[in-house]
Amino acid sequence: MKFVEQKPVSDIRITKDGIGKDVGIYCWWFRDDCLKNLLNEISELVDLNRLNTEKEQHKVLNGSKYTALYVGIAAGKDGILGRFKWHINQKHTVSNVQKGYISTLRRTISALLNFKLLKNGAEVNLQSQENLNTFIDENCILEWNYYPKKTKKELEHIEDEIINSGYFPLNIQGNKQISKEMRDKLSEIRDTICSIP
């Protein structure tokens, strides 16, 4: 899959100019320098040989090597813009954390890096929110395509084809390329960082 639009997360955090509200599909690219740390918690379950041989999931962006680890759809009323705001600018509140309203991708990255979302029982861990934002600002680039005429079902079909024609270990739902054990492990560690002791 070739994506037309591209912007570093740090730039998107500063300004949403040029990002439209059309529905579409997007891809998260992670700097290769961060992969060992990011995937350490699930290293025994990630097929690194498979990941390394997926040529379409590797490229040089802005002078650094990147690997695509996650693909998603933006089918809501605010399309790509709304989805990026949710993934990038979402505030961690006690209610959002407890009710599971934090973006699954934010929870997954936080869990993999052991950034606890709550502390002292029921207080938001603002340091973890800041650490997560810094991590994605320094290590992630987003690419996307708009599909203004596609329905949510059509977008899900395209997303499914992309996920299952490659190896995207951070995609859980509908991903036939990762093991049940890995899905269970990701769910477990996501629950751990959101739980109240």
Question: Where does each model-flagged region fall?
Answer:
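Boundary/linker segments flanking structured domains
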Residues: 1-197
